[in-house]
């Protein structure tokens, strides 16, 4: 679903409370920065960021040298918030249990570390809604849910937004369905590497 609107419609659920954000992509970064902004005007708001990996270097982007200036600025702002103590960062964190109680949630992480929070914002990935296409014979990569020929070109394990090579219509094709193509962000399936600029090349 959409990112939580912590500065708008969801403000009442998180203002003055402890919020755990899980994930290390752009959705997590934007949610964290919105919560930091909220915390500046809503005393008692506490922000914790949990990531599975040992490092968040990739989430910080390339700063001023980033090929995508907006991504570099997003990462620089996030790094600054963590370094200033506005966001508590937990690396190597995997949630093993969540228990609801009267005043919030108890989240157990690997190593039996417990956090007491009021809300969790899960920003751990997304997938395209392919229900409309269920009756078609699509050739999709099982991990990315993107066209089979496109998947290796956009795999986030090997590419970021700036390293995806230009590709043509052939990579979007589904041989069993001649003339059928999924285009735009949905064509990238679960990969967060979609850029309009790549489509114009």
Predicted regions and their residues:
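A conserved FAD-binding loop/helix module that cradles the flavin
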Residues: 39, 167-201
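Short catalytic/ligand-binding loop motif for oxyanion handling, primarily in non-cytosolic enzymes
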Residues: 29-30, 58, 129-131, 189-191
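A Rossmann-like FAD-binding core segment of flavoenzymes
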Residues: 36-142
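Glycine-rich dinucleotide-binding loop and its adjacent helix/turn
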Residues: 1-39, 47, 144-154, 165-169
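Mid-domain beta-loop-alpha active-site segment that forms a flexible
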Residues: 24-34, 73, 77, 195, ...
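Cofactor-binding loop segments of dinucleotide-utilizing enzymes, especially the Rossmann-like FAD-
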Residues: 24, 52, 185
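Short, surface-exposed loop/helix-turn segments at secondary-structure junctions
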Residues: 133-161
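Residues forming the flavin
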Residues: 6-8, 12-22, 28-31, 96-99, ...
């Amino acid at each position: 679903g959409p990112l939580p609107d912590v500065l708008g419609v969801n403000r009442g659920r998180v203002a003055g409370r402890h919020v755990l954000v899980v994930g290390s992509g752009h959705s997590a970064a934007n949610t964290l920065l919105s919560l930091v902004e909220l915390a500046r005007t809503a005393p008692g708001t506490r922000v914790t960021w949990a990531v599975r990996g040992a490092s968040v270097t990739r989430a910080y982007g390339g700063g001023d040298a980033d090929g995508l200036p907006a991504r570099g600025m997003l990462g620089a702002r996030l790094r600054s918030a963590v370094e200033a103590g506005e966001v508590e960062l937990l690396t190597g964190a995997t949630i093993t249990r969540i228990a609801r109680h009267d005043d919030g949630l108890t989240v157990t992480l690997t190593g039996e570390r417990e956090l007491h929070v009021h809300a969790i914002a899960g920003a751990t990935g997304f997938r395209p809604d392919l229900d409309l296409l269920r009756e078609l014979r699509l050739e999709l990569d099982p991990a990315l849910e993107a066209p089979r020929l496109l998947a290796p070109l956009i795999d986030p394990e090997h590419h970021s937004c700036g390293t995806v090579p230009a590709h043509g219509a052939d990579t979007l094709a589904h041989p069993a369905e001649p003339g059928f193509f999924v285009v735009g962000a949905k064509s990238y399936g679960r990969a967060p590497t979609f850029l309009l600029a790549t489509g114009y090349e």
